[in-house]
Each structure stands twice: as structure tokens, then as C-alpha cells.
């Protein structure tokens, strides 16, 4: 057997590909990535087992150009599948599934997996077509149960967390807050100005709080300008970081900020920050509209705020009433739940190759 793992982006930007690779390695099944080098980088060309389609395609290009670029990538994938004698396909994203769906349905019926980790506006037009492709797959996976709110209700989906199984079992110890300085970390892409500026204005004039923003993004420059305008002295931007630095950055924090926009995608995702907070046992700040708030409330993992709340007051109340035993118990319980769902995902993927 030979498996193709299709991703319409650079494989270095998609760590979740390894969840499938882990299973295939255990079963000693040969596999190849078929990826799209959209930024013209040479990094992906050096990766093992990676068949690369190179065409620069920025996120900001017009919609018709995106359509043409996806058509070209899909043609490249079809040609590789035909010439490479593949037996099974794992295709990531709704967009790639739609462009390849007709071909997969005809030549790989019940021999492909659709993996969904993002919402796509293409579903507004092509929802019924996508439904057909889901019905003809061997397995359908989602990175968040929140996606079920906009996916077909008569189709079975398996949760594939944005986490490898070995990461869940890392045992970090909870460290009590340093009451002199509370360190609130926002880590990862800084895409949204509104939610991040809300955090900055909530704590920007509080000497007892240090706000740390680690990562780049479209909103970073505007947020830095806001801090300068407000003359806040307790906000730090450290920019891009290496993956190997991530654990040390998180360990120095007391809270993880996960306030997100309230669009259909953002309220339904399980963010990487959420998993970092759980693994490192760091209380988190989430907005009540998000699916992450359900877990935070159920397992007592932090502070849930709405649009009217005074975030600073809620955080200080949480600290005053904080029970370390209850918090650690909640971390243990959610890690157990995540572990069981990862095990179920791996078993279902393995069953596709039995």
C-alpha cells in the first residue's frame, strides 16, 4: 500500500500532518506528502517524502486568482496520484477536498480521508457537493467539535486534536502566581486587532501586570502603535520565536490569553494556545462565545469573559478565589479526555488500512 497526504500549503506550517504520519510509520506503510509551496520558500524542498508544487499565491490576491491557483494545484495532485500508483489519499482542507472531490469520488471511493481544520466560505455555495464527498470517504476528521455546528448533521466525524499523543503526557507542575507581577501571555499569530487591543487596554495601565506578546502577524504593528500612543510601560512584544523556544516562553507565564474574534470560524476552533495552556497547566482567558469556554467552565481552567465584562476585575477575582487543587484536577481530567480522543482518532485511522 502507498498513501498520499495532500496539503495545499507548506508542510512546515501544518504540524498536524504528523498525526497521520505517526500512524502510517507504526503500520510500516509508505507515504508521501504532496504539498504546495505558496511562499516560494526553499525550506519545504528539503523535507523528506515531500512532492512539492511551487506557485506563489498570497492570501491577499483576488478571489478569481485563488480559484485558478487551486485549479492548478489540483491538476498537479491528480497527475501525481495517477503516476504514483497510490492506494489511499488523506486530503486536508475544505478547499482541496472540493477541488479534488470529483476525482477522489471516482477513483478513490471509500479510500480517502477528509481532514477539516478551518472554515471555508466555499461551503456557502458548495455545501451539498461537499456533503457528497464526505459520504464517499473512509473517514472524516475535524480539529474541533465546534465545527459540527456548520457541517452536515447526518455525517460522522472524528475529532483530531491539534496535539500529538506524546505531548499530552508531559507533566508540567503548576506554579503559584507571583502576586507582585501577573504575567499574561499572548503567543502565536497576532491576526486580530480588536481582541488584542482589548487585552492591552484592560491591563495596560496596571503596574501589577505584565503583558507579553510573542509572535508576529498582521495586527502586530498596529498594536505596537497603540501601546506607544497610550504610553503603556507594561506591554512587551518579542516577535517571532523558534518552535524550540515555545515551552520556555509559556512556562514563564501565569495566564494565557485566548480572546478571539466572534466570527463563525474563530468561535468554533480549538486553538493551539488552548493546548499549550492545558499541557503547561496555565489558567487561560477566553471569551464566552467560543467553544473553548465550555471546557474552561467545565474543568475550571480559567476566566470566561463577555463583551461587557471588566477583564481586569474578573481576573483579580479569579486569583483571589483560586484553588490550586481544583485547577490541577481539571487539568488532569481534560488531559484524560483529550488522550482518549487522540487514541480513538488513531484507531480509526488505523482501521482504514486494515
Task: Provide a role label for each language-model segment.
Residues 121, 135-179:
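Donor nucleotide-sugar binding/catalytic pocket of nucleotide-sugar-dependent glycosyltransferases
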Residues 194, 244-249, 256-276, 285-294:
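Nucleotide-sugar-dependent
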Residues 10-12, 23-71:
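N-terminal strand-loop element at the rim of the active site
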Residues 1-40, 84, 139, 201-205:
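N-terminal subdomain of nucleotide-sugar transferases
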Residues 306-313, 319-354:
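A charged, aromatic-enriched C-terminal amphipathic alpha-helix characteristic of glycosyltransferases
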Residues 221-248:
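Nucleotide-activated donor-binding/catalytic signature segment of Leloir-type glycosyltransferases, i.e.
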Residues 22, 74-79, 98-102, 106-107, ...:
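Membrane-proximal helix-turn-helix segments that form the acceptor-binding/catalytic region
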Residues 6, 141, 175-195, 199-206, ...:
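Conserved donor-binding/catalytic core segment of Leloir-type glycosyltransferases
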Amino acid at each position: 500500500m502507498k498513501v498520499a497526504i495532500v496539503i495545499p500549503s507548506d508542510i512546515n506550517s501544518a504540524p498536524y500532518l504528523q498525526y497521520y504520519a505517526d500512524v502510517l510509520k507504526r503500520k510500516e506503510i509508505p507515504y508521501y506528502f504532496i504539498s504546495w509551496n505558496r511562499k516560494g520558500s526553499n525550506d519545504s524542498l528539503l523535507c523528506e517524502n515531500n512532492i512539492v508544487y511551487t506557485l506563489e499565491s498570497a492570501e491577499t490576491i483576488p478571489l478569481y486568482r485563488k480559484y485558478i491557483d487551486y485549479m492548478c494545484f489540483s491538476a498537479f495532485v491528480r497527475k501525481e496520484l495517477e503516476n504514483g500508483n497510490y492506494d489511499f489519499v488523506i486530503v486536508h482542507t475544505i478547499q482541496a477536498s472540493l477541488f479534488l472531490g470529483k476525482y477522489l469520488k471516482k477513483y478513490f471511493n471509500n479510500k480517502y480521508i477528509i481532514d477539516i481544520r478551518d472554515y471555508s466560505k466555499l461551503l456557502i455555495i458548495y455545501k451539498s457537493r461537499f456533503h457528497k464527498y464526505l459520504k464517499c470517504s473512509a473517514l472524516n476528521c475535524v480539529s474541533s467539535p465546534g465545527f459540527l455546528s456548520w457541517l452536515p448533521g447526518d455525517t460522522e466525524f472524528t475529532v483530531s486534536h491539534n496535539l500529538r499523543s506524546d505531548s499530552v503526557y508531559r507533566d508540567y507542575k503548576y506554579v503559584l502566581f507571583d502576586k507582585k507581577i501577573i504575567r499574561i501571555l499572548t503567543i502565536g499569530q497576532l491576526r486580530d486587532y480588536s481582541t488584542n487591543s482589548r487585552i492591552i487596554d484592560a491591563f495596560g495601565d496596571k503596574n501589577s501586570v505584565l503583558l507579553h506578546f510573542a509572535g508576529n502577524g498582521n495586527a502586530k504593528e498596529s498594536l505596537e502603535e497603540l501601546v506607544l500612543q497610550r504610553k503603556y510601560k507594561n506591554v512587551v512584544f518579542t516577535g517571532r520565536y523558534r518552535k524550540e523556544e515555545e515551552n520556555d516562553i509559556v512556562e514563564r507565564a501565569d495566564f494565557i490569553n485566548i480572546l478571539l474574534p466572534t466570527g463563525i470560524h474563530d468561535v468554533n476552533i480549538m486553538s493551539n494556545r488552548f493546548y499549550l495552556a492545558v499541557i503547561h497547566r496555565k489558567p487561560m482567558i477566553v471569551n464566552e462565545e467560543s467553544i473553548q469556554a465550555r471546557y474552561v467552565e467545565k474543568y475550571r481552567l480559567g476566566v470566561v469573559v463577555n463583551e461587557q465584562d471588566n477583564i481586569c476585575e474578573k481576573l483579580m477575582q479569579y486569583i483571589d478565589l483560586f484553588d490550586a487543587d481544583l485547577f490541577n484536577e481539571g487539568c488532569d481530567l481534560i488531559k484524560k479526555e483529550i488522550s482518549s480522543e487522540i487514541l480513538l482518532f488513531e484507531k480509526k485511522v488505523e482501521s482504514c488500512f486494515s
